[in-house]
Curated annotation (Swiss-Prot):
Matching Pfam families: GatB_N (PF02934), GatB_Yqey (PF02637)
Summary of the function given for this chain in its UniProt record: Allows the formation of correctly charged Asn-tRNA(Asn) or Gln-tRNA(Gln) through the transamidation of misacylated Asp-tRNA(Asn) or Glu-tRNA(Gln) in organisms which lack either or both of asparaginyl-tRNA or glutaminyl-tRNA synthetases. The reaction takes place in the presence of glutamine and ATP through an activated phospho-Asp-tRNA(Asn) or phospho-Glu-tRNA(Gln).
Similarity annotation: Belongs to the GatB/GatE family. GatB subfamily.
Keyword terms: ATP-binding, Ligase, Nucleotide-binding, Protein biosynthesis
Name of the coding gene: gatB
UniProt source species: Wolbachia pipientis wMel
Molecular-function GO term, any one: ATP binding
PANTHER family: GLUTAMYL-TRNA GLN AMIDOTRANSFERASE SUBUNIT B MITOCHONDRIAL AND PROKARYOTIC PET112-RELATED (PTHR11659), GLUTAMYL-TRNA(GLN) AMIDOTRANSFERASE SUBUNIT B, MITOCHONDRIAL (PTHR11659:SF0)
Catalytic function, reaction form: L-glutamyl-tRNA(Gln) + L-glutamine + ATP + H2O = L-glutaminyl-tRNA(Gln) + L-glutamate + ADP + phosphate + H(+); L-aspartyl-tRNA(Asn) + L-glutamine + ATP + H2O = L-asparaginyl-tRNA(Asn) + L-glutamate + ADP + phosphate + 2 H(+)
Protein name: Aspartyl/glutamyl-tRNA(Asn/Gln) amidotransferase subunit B
Length: 474
């Protein structure tokens, strides 16, 4: 048998940190990068006698996420205790939602909306702390302990690492659009576990799955899944059986390694959390959250294509990130969409890519670019000079109006002034005038170039063409 005879079956468990200033069951800050153990309440440290108090904002964000994924909202849900021991879990259990999650039966589309990936559930849970290893000692940092996570669990509908990566990107895109998670994988705000198994193509029976934990970049998701698929195929083709294990991905070697044998639900002894009341959500509350949802990326993309006439490629690029889409929306408040697309995707993106920064860090904000386009559209400067001004704006952060004034770039539109320049050029180049009139029309560009040279590029192209055509036709 060859690799082509096998089929991968993949499901994702995506852990998305709720964009909340405080934790799920305490008022401790969730700010990233604080000193170790400076954002820990008595509840987070599991001091005896302390009780959790639910941060209802996190419930609203989970509902918001569920609605964005076309899911069902459970009007009655509750929390459970997941019992296990780990040094950075001070309670000895994690408060999660096992029996009745807040959200179920959603979906997300990938492959240009051609494939539906079912979302089994979204539940809220608290994050654990972090073990910090230094030489022969290990320290525990509880700053993350109790931070609210949404666990978004997909059905095993993915069939390749590429599909898993696209699903992760699509979920991140939606989460950022609705504001329930910032999607920053570098800071740990978004990570996932991948459940991977293989089976012969055509089979409807699931193979033994292994879970790869804590994948925190799209690249690692692809590498880990690809390696694991190949590993399992080689084991099965050698006549051995897959062991149901929990794995870690070693970035240095590019291989998965066994962390522990995979647990079943019974190993965690789930039972309802006795210190928290069930969560009841009214239909009115659900409707209110639904009405507050912004235009989602697929809806926005369709609008750009159908209403603004933008091609599918550019629409994909612009809607890929909410910050880019917001920037574009600001531009088209005053300007033609095609002009905005060109300046955004060609001029701005070109400079951002060269500088290695994203649009959020751009030295040219949307209102500043819009002002520059005002000057180009009203003829104050030419499009060519506009690019020169744009470069200066990018380098200095100065507004277009100031740069135009400082560099004396205001376009010459006075017909009398331009006529004098053109007459001078024609008088000094009678031989070329005769050649032009005898059929060498390509010389027209020579005359335009001479006008621009003498006016230092400031002459209005429209006025130049109008007068020059008239002079050369006489």
């Amino acid at each position: 048998m060859t690799k082509e005879d096998w089929e991968a079956v993949i499901g994702l468990e995506v852990h998305a940190q709720v964009s909340s200033n405080t934790k799920l069951f305490s008022s401790s800050s969730t700010e990233f990068g604080a000193e170790h153990n400076t954002q820990v309440s008595l509840v987070d440290a599991a001091m005896p006698g302390t009780l959790p108090i639910l941060n209802y904002y996190c419930i609203e964000q989970a509902i918001r996420t569920g609605l964005a994924l076309s899911a069902e909202i459970n009007k009655y849900s509750y929390f459970d205790r997941k019992n296990y021991f780990y040094p950075d879990l001070p309670q000895g259990y994690q408060i999660t939602q096992f029996f009745e999650p807040i959200v179920k039966n959603g979906r997300v589309f990938i492959n240009d909306n051609e494939k539906e990936i079912r979302i089994a559930r979204i539940h809220l849970e608290q994050d654990a702390g972090k073990s910090v290893h230094e030489e022969s000692k290990t320290y525990v940092d509880l700053n993350r302990a109790g931070v609210a996570l949404m666990e978004i669990v997909s059905e095993p509908d993915l069939r390749s690492s590429a599909e898993a990566a696209e699903c992760m990107k699509k979920l991140r895109q939606i989460l950022r659009y609705i504001g329930s998670c910032d999607g920053d994988m570098e800071k740990g705000s978004l990570r996932c576990d991948a459940n991977v198994s293989v089976r012969l193509k055509g089979s409807s029976t699931f193979g033994t799955r292994c879970e790869i934990k804590n994948l925190n970049s799209i690249r690692y998701i692809v590498q880990a899944i690809d390696y694991e698929i190949q590993r399992q195929i080689e084991i099965l083709e050698s006549g051995e059986e897959i062991s149901q294990d929990t794995l870690l991905f070693d970035v240095a070697s590019g291989k998965t390694k066994v962390m522990r044998s995979k647990e079943d639900a019974s190993d965690y002894r789930y039972f309802p959390e006795p210190d928290l009341l069930p969560v009841e959500v009214s239909q009115d509350k659900i409707d209110l959250i639904q009405s507050s949802l912004p235009e989602l990326p697929d809806q926005k993309k369709l609008r750009y294509i159908e209403e603004l006439g933008i091609n599918e490629y550019d629409a994909n690029v612009i809607t890929s990130d909410k910050a880019i889409a917001d920037y574009f929306e600001e531009l088209i408040k005053k300007h033609d969409s095609k002009l905005a697309v060109t300046w955004l995707t060609v001029e701005l993106f070109g400079r951002l890519n060269k500088a290695g920064i994203d649009i959020v860090s751009s030295p040219i904000k949307a209102n500043a670019l819009s002002e520059l386009l005002d000057f180009i559209v009203d003829g104050t400067i030419s499009a060519k000079l506009g690019k020169q001004v744009f470069d200066s704006m990018f380098e200095t952060g100065k507004p277009a109006s100031l740069i135009i004034e400082e560099q004396g770039l205001k376009q010459i539109t006075d017909r009398g002034q331009i006529s004098e320049v053109i007459d001078k050029i024609i008088n000094n180049n009678q031989d070329k005038v005769q050649e032009y009139k005898s059929g060498k029309t390509k010389l027209y560009g020579f005359f335009v170039g001479e006008v621009m040279k003498l006016t230092k590029g400031k002459a209005s192209p429209d006025v130049v063409n109008s007068i020059l055509s008239e002079r050369l036709s006489n």
